[in-house]
Amino acid sequence: LPISEFYTADCQKNTLNIERKIRNLMREVTLNKGGTFTIKSVEVMPESLPAVFTRLVADNVGQYEKSLVIDLGGTTLDVGVIVGQFEDVSAVHGNPDIGVSMVTKATLTALKMASSDTSPMIADELIKNRNNLDFVGQVVNEVSKLNLVLDTIDTAINKLGELVVDDLLQYRNVNRV
């Protein structure tokens, strides 16, 4: 589950959400070729926090050090503060209004303005390859709008960065990010 759904606002496990997730997964599954199997056991974990566990151990993080874990997804920003090597989770936060899709949407709008109506997949590839002018030229139909498209991408990325930083200001007192 996303951090903000796995934990309550006071950093306790949200047993209601966890049980709901388990019930949703404990079922018979039918494969494409007709075979079936039943899921008999499920362990629900908070997204992104376990991913840093090996790093915390490798870095020999002390028991009182606080680590800020940031998970910037397509449509959400999830944050957790881990104490030590996962001895405790001292803060959780989720913001459903901040995500990478903000850049994708801005790019799609700019592409439409450049007579290049396309898909989110192509927009995402353009964002990743925006410094490859050969690729940009293949995607942007109206060459006179090429700078508009690239400027829109840069502006959207900068805006996303500002929103993330602003949203994380309350976590200034951590030891590591």
Residue ranges with predicted function:
Residues G80-I122:
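Glycine-rich phosphate-binding loop plus the immediately following alpha-helix
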Residues L1-V69, E87-V100, L133-V177:
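Nucleotide/phosphate-binding catalytic cleft detector across ATP-hydrolyzing
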Residues L49, I70-V81:
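Hydrophobic, aromatic-enriched interface-forming segments
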Residues S115-V136:
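Conserved, helical-rich catalytic subdomain that frames metal- and/or nucleotide-binding sites
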